[in-house]
């Protein structure tokens, strides 16, 4: 095929239940000038064979099969190393997600408005829920630092999963990992890094779908409150880069209090050791570990609140017991 403008990348591992739908959503794009790179991370189901069947019928598809099992983020970095030199834009589509037909076309329109735009996102569906709402409806392009400040101050989360974002390919340096392999939530942190130097585009259309019943994601991890850890790490790492010093200090303190309050609540639910290992592993990426004394103070505050609000406490306990028996 001729040199493509867009490289679409789908790394996968044992996603045979969803891979066909994912591939067909890319093939159905109204924008046609793309290559599609499917990278099999040592699947033990028939995902690799499914990918090969589609590649046999569509010359735009390349299938790469790894011999060594990689972690998820290593697999993504490995897949991004396979881009054609001619591509100008990169679209990741996770193997259990899919994109709607005008996704690439509408995102490209935004990139074409300004060479300063480094990444573009849009509304997306997480199961049946609309995500990405809150972006100013009269605006499509924001200076990167303004977008980062908005996220830090309000929690406006418009980056979504990797499937919701498209990147300018020049941001992916050959021979260097795109995502930080030490991070638990590498996609959010990568977006924040890019916003320090690049502007942000947003399409006010629903352009992608991410599963909420994803069997490839451990239900245990979903119960670990990953969003709270992600928010805490991003604020601690980036607040001083984008905000005035006094505001940054205040935000970091407030976010720490909120994060430890969530940990305190989970303590009363007798969370297993894997919960604490998960959070300690995440905190280690910013040179921290769980502060036991700070956690104890938050637990005392929670106990006082529970004592002063017996009605709500009883309701919470009943909900917890109901959840454990269903």
What are these language model-derived features?
Residues 102-135:
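Conserved donor NDP-sugar-binding/catalytic core segment of glycosyltransferases
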Residues 40-49, 68:
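A conserved acidic beta->alpha catalytic loop
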Residues 266-326:
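Membrane-interface aromatic/basic loop that binds lipid-linked glycans or pyrophosphate carriers
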Residues 66-85:
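Glycine-rich, basic loop-to-helix element that forms the pyrophosphate-binding segment
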Residues 86-98:
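Short beta-strand-to-loop acidic/aromatic patch adjacent to the donor-nucleotide binding site
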Residues 3-6, 27-38, 46, 58-62:
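Short loop->beta transition adjacent to catalytic acidic/histidine clusters or analogous donor-positioning motifs
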Residues 14-28:
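Short, well-formed alpha-helical segments that are part of the catalytic scaffolds
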Residues 141-231:
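Conserved nucleotide-sugar donor-binding catalytic segment
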